[in-house]
Amino acid sequence: IEMHLHRIEGLAEEYLYFNDDMFPVGHCVQTDFFRDGKGVIGMYRHLLSPNMYKKICRISDQVGRRLAGKRSALTFMRPQHICSPMLKSVCTQVYDSNVPEIRQTAECRSRTEKNLCQYVYLDYMYHKGLIIPEKISNRHFSVALASADRLKDFLKNPDTKLVCINDVKL
């Protein structure tokens, strides 16, 4: 689903993709996420891809690099795990490039380590200079580790703009 949001009729050119574990909790303004026609999000370089999530991130970066006309690299970029600032026209351009990995992901009934994710759009944007690599104000909580009281205290008095409440250890 996340790979197809840009196809929603009437969707704005600049839109935010929120995964089901991301929530705005503080005052946010458009410039937190978009400036001068570019998305704003932290981007991090990784070398190893030991799990399915990181393997998907690696493939998404490889496709984004290739479409941006960049050489492959030993490392890969992973966007900050927070809402994603998307540019509809760029997502459409990448999606319409008809690369095999996009078709294979669309045809797959369940996620595998050979799939892409919506990060392919952010990776392409990054490699084309359409990302301002700046960390978005956020906090992460894992329900596997954080106490209910700690989470409640944060939600009553947040010190960041966004929060990720995840069901896995981050």
Please annotate each region the language model reported.
Residues H4, R66, Q93-V94, Y124, ...:
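Residues that form generic nucleotide/phosphate-binding pockets
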Residues I1-A12:
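Active-site-proximal specificity loops/subdomain of glycosyltransferases
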Residues F34-N115:
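Long, charge-rich alpha-helical interaction segments
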Residues H4-L5, A106-S110, R150-K152:
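Generic recognition of flexible, low-complexity loop/linker segments
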Residues T112, C117-L170:
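Long, low-complexity C-terminal extensions of enzymes
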Residues F23-H27, D32-R35, Q118, L170:
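Short catalytic/ligand-binding loop motif for oxyanion handling, primarily in non-cytosolic enzymes
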Residues A12-V25:
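Short beta-strand-to-loop acidic/aromatic patch adjacent to the donor-nucleotide binding site
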Residues I1-E2, M22, K114-Y119:
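Conserved glycosyltransferase catalytic-site signature
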